[in-house]
């Protein structure tokens, strides 16, 4: 096996009002009563109950946001949530410790690694790249060219779903579909959720 491929999309929080700096794209697309059908079979993760930068929040506010977000999503989807995506990439040792104490197995930051390494710390899970960055396509092509070695590789791409409505460069649904088509159906890649990629790494590392 060459490696694992995993993807993360963030959607606009239902019922949360923001003064978004890019009002020319629609953020609230899927009604709450349709989300279970739309996201059936997908892994669900928290992102802050009110999109708070948890690393900059007071301890009580941080804990309340994590607890409320986790409880709401678990009630809606009827599943246990074990993953988190830091809003604005904001985190801290206290935030990470609290997430682990609440049963979280991983949490993603936004700063790209530009490579294919598994995370040393799943609570500080760095993606390979954002899908809308100019280097995303080149990174995917480099991943496909890599020869299997002693260590498995991880291609981890993320984006906000509304960014695909920008219709500029990589930030379009057309570009996204072409990229996924270019990497789909390969026997040397395991396509998995964020949670599964973390579990695979921990198992191989004997942790």
How should each PLM-predicted stretch be described?
Residues 1-95, 114-124, 153-164:
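Metal-dependent polysaccharide deacetylase catalytic core of the NodB/CE4 family, i.e.
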Residues 97-104:
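Short, surface-exposed basic-aromatic patches at helix termini and helix-loop junctions that form
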Residues 130-147:
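A Trp-anchored, charged/polar loop motif used as the substrate-binding/catalytic surface
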């Amino acid at each position: 096996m060459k490696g694992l491929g995993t993807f993360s999309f963030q959607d606009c929080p239902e019922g949360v009002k923001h003064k978004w700096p890019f009002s020319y794209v629609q953020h609230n697309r899927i009604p709450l009563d349709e989300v279970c059908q739309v996201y059936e079979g997908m892994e669900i993760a928290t992102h802050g109950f009110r999109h708070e930068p948890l690393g900059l929040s007071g301890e009580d506010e941080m804990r309340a946001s994590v607890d409320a977000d986790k409880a709401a999503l678990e009630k809606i989807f009827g599943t246990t949530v074990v993953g988190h995506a830091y809003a604005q990439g904001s985190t801290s040792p206290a935030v990470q410790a609290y997430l682990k104490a609440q049963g979280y197995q991983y949490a993603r930051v936004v700063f790209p690694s530009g490579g294919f390494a598994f995370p040393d710390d799943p609570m500080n899970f760095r993606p390979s790249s954002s899908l809308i960055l100019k280097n995303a396509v080149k990174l995917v092509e480099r991943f496909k060219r890599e020869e299997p070695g002693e260590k498995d590789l991880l291609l981890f791409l993320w984006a906000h779903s509304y960014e695909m409505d920008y219709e500029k460069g990589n930030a379009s649904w057309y570009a996204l579909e072409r990229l996924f088509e270019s990497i789909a159906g390969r026997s040397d890649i395991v396509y998995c959720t964020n949670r599964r990629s973390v579990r695979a790494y921990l198992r191989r590392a004997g942790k």
